Amino acid sequence: MGITVRNLHKRFGEFAALDDVSLDFPAGELVALLGPSGCGKTTLLRVIAGLEHADSGQVVLQGLDVASVGARERQVGFVFQHYALFRHMTVFENVAFGLRVKPRRERPSEAAIRAKVHELLSLVQLDWLAQRYPSELSGGQRQRIALARALAVEPKVLLLDEPFGALDAKVRKELRGWLRRLHDDLHISTIFVTHDQEEALEVADRIVVLNHGRVEQVGSPQAVYDHPRSAFVYEFLGAANRLDGTVSGNGFVAHGAAQAIAVDADFAGPARAYVRPHDLELAAPHARAQGIAADVRRVVPLGGSVRVELAARSGEVLEAELDRNAWRALALDVGDALTAVPRAVRVFPAR
């Protein structure tokens, strides 16, 4: 089922949680709402679910304005960050709950409920835990059971509010891949909230970046990462080095640098340039005409890569990320002088 929201406004006192938000969510897509705390992503999810009401604007499900439709009638499945499983019920009973509390005329037979629950537990690969209680499960298992419970009532839309936020990093990574595979099997329209950039980039078909209640950018993960429309989007989507300087006909000149760096810019004047740590190449001093003079401040091994912290002569602190072969070839020590050469630079007007 496709979802459309039009001109949504929602305030909590003086705070604008949603400020004229309009979006289309095509049927069958897995869409991430990404942004910092307080950006409006959870409020938007709750308005779509019917758990909050917008001050103005429309929510359209299957072509119908559902402003006057309650949460229960919207046929939406909702999964919270903190599982919300019933502690006194077994896994089986938790998943069956939504089916058993349906109105009598809509309620399946007990045999049909049993079959449905076992089907869903098999889908989330936890059928063997049917008679366990939530206290006997790991965090990752509880969240998969919560998802099975949401799917039991066959929702038209699945809404996930930071579903993996309470889990440790290793389990989160495993469940991200599992959620993507599950979505590919079910093709149910899904919107999930996250502040984890890596999670959004890995799992989603499309990303909606929100900031201060407004939509900053919408697009595929690759498009949003490679072509950010604002400095906020660039910085939020991953580690970034920031350089202040000026754009002129020769390119971008960082404060304190002698040489311009070639950039693609449609403006001139004060600017802020960004470069990812993995796009910062390190070379011997004066080895490159275009580059930033810097000294090594710290070297941090990170498993398969090495992070090198640099003190630029212009005063900025920069980070470069090298693979271990490049690091060994450079034989860097703290205090060494070098030239940092940006391979891919994005510039935005200074504000």
From Swiss-Prot:
What keywords were assigned to this record? ATP-binding, Cell inner membrane, Cell membrane, Membrane, Nucleotide-binding, Sulfate transport, Translocase, Transport
Q: Which reaction does it catalyse?
A: sulfate(out) + ATP + H2O = sulfate(in) + ADP + phosphate + H(+); thiosulfate(out) + ATP + H2O = thiosulfate(in) + ADP + phosphate + H(+)
Membrane topology label? Peripheral membrane protein
Major place of residence: membrane
Relate the assembly described in the record: The complex is composed of two ATP-binding proteins (CysA), two transmembrane proteins (CysT and CysW) and a solute-binding protein (CysP).
- State the compartments where it is located: Cell inner membrane
* Record-listed ATP binding positions: G35, P36, S37, G38, C39, G40, K41, T42
Which GO CC terms are listed, alphabetically? Answer: ATP-binding cassette (ABC) transporter complex
A GO molecular function annotation here is: ATP hydrolysis activity
Q: What job does this protein perform?
A: Part of the ABC transporter complex CysAWTP involved in sulfate/thiosulfate import. Responsible for energy coupling to the transport system.
Q: What is this protein called?
A: Sulfate/thiosulfate import ATP-binding protein CysA
EC number from the UniProt entry: 7.3.2.3
| Domain ABC transporter as annotated: residue spans | 3-237
User: Which family does the entry's similarity section mention?
Assistant: Belongs to the ABC transporter superfamily. Sulfate/tungstate importer (TC 3.A.1.6) family.
The family database entries (Gene3D superfamilies) matched by this protein are listed as: P-loop containing nucleotide triphosphate hydrolases
Highest taxon in the source lineage: Bacteria
**Species the sequence originates in:** Burkholderia mallei (strain ATCC 23344)
Q: Which Pfam families match?
A: ABC_tran, TOBE_3
